[in-house]
């Protein structure tokens, strides 16, 4: 197995990639992005349920002709990179196996996102490979690019946390967030391919409804990462997070209502966000409210900060399958391999 050396791909040799779990929405998109990436070679795609089928039969729009196989870690040879698109719990053993083979890994599940093991166990159950937690890097490049560059295991963020953290990070870093209410809305693809009755056409069409308004698994992820960048003694005292399912296939909007610790003007608020994101190629600061359609099929996040009547309000939109999952995985992988982070996703 090839050892992790940087940069891979810049000498003309493509990094060889396996996508494990390529039949879900995020896994299939990841496979397509790798397939079309100039510095990556997609050598294998796997499925736990649809082996023997070519991916382009399940997703004709992607045009990936490789046949889905059953994952056989012992049989992998000369593979540099693993992208794991398994559900939480099922992903960790696969990640551990790939790391044992010397592969660098981007994991799309929640298994390595949380630093605090008891918090993980509270929301997801027992962890099969907790020893890997300390070496995992949270893969939000706009938050911790330097750590991503040096990482060998990336915990790709959740879709809601990606949008919410990007929306709120400048305020958190300034120690300004006292209390925040996050009203989030996501397309149906965010629930995954096997969503069941709750995400069926009959249920979601012409309908908007909250789900898991208390105890949603993404709340501790958002809170942990924002408090990690907050000054000592100026963490977030209270957070309410309520997601909603809206009748669109993909896209995500978060509206964040922030009680700030000290008054701030609109000019100062915009300057705070410009100082934080002015050099970020995938973050666009807006003067008008953004919509889901503005970022569909892109790795972009559009943000509008506003001083409202009683609170600071921050809107952010992403494509939940792209920046919220698969294209962010490629952004992370580009950085890990010493490539320009926009290759294959710009």
Regions found by a protein language model. Name each.
Residues 1-213, 231-234, 306-308, 343-345:
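N-terminal Rossmann-like NAD(P) cofactor-binding subdomain of oxidoreductases
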Residues 25, 135, 159-166, 213-221, ...:
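Conserved active-site and cofactor/substrate-binding residues in soluble primary-metabolism enzymes
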Residues 136, 237, 299-301:
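Short beta-strand or tight-loop elements
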Residues 210-214, 246-247, 291-295:
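Short Gly/Pro-enriched turn/cap motifs at secondary-structure boundaries
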Residues 215-285:
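C-terminal substrate-binding/catalytic lobe of Rossmann-fold NAD(P)-dependent dehydrogenases
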Residues 254-346:
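C-terminal active-site/capping subdomain that shapes the small-molecule cofactor and substrate pocket
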């Amino acid at each position: 197995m090839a050892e992790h050396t940087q940069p891979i791909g810049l000498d003309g040799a493509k990094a060889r990639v396996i996508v494990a779990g390529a039949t879900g929405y995020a896994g299939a998109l990841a496979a397509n992005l790798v397939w079309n990436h100039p510095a990556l070679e997609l050598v294998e795609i796997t499925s736990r349920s649809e082996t023997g089928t070519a991916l382009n039969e399940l997703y004709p729009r992607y045009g990936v002709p490789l046949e889905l196989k059953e994952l056989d870690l012992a049989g992998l040879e000369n593979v540099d990179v693993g992208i794991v698109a398994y559900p939480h719990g099922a992903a960790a053993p696969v990640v551990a196996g790939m790391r044992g083979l010397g592969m660098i890994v981007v994991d799309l599940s929640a298994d390595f996102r949380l630093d605090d093991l008891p918090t993980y166990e509270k929301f997801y159950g027992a962890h099969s490979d907790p020893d890997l937690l300390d070496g995992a890097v949270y893969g939000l490049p706009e938050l911790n690019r330097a750590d991503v560059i040096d990482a060998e295991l990336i915990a790709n963020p959740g879709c809601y946390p990606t949008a919410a953290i990007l929306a709120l990070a400048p305020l958190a870093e300034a120690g300004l967030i006292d209390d925040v209410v996050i009203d989030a809305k996501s397309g149906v693809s965010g629930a995954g391919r096997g969503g069941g009755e709750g995400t069926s056409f009959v249920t979601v069409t012409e309908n908007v409804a909250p789900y898991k308004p208390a105890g949603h698994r993404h709340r501790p992820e958002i809170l942990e990462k924002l408090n990690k960048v907050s000054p000592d003694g100026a963490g977030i005292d209270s957070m309410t997070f309520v997601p909603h399912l809206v009748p669109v296939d993909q896209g995500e909007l978060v509206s964040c209502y922030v009680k700030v610790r000290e008054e701030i003007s609109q000019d100062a608020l915009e300057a705070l966000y410009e100082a934080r994101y002015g050099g970020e190629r995938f973050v666009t600061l807006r003067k008008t409210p953004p919509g889901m359609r503005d970022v569909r099929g892109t790795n972009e996040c559009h943000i509008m900060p506003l001083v409202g009547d009683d609170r600071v309000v921050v809107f952010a939109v992403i494509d939940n399958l792209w920046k919220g999952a698969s294209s962010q995985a490629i952004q992370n992988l580009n950085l890990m391999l010493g490539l320009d982070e926009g290759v294959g996703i710009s």
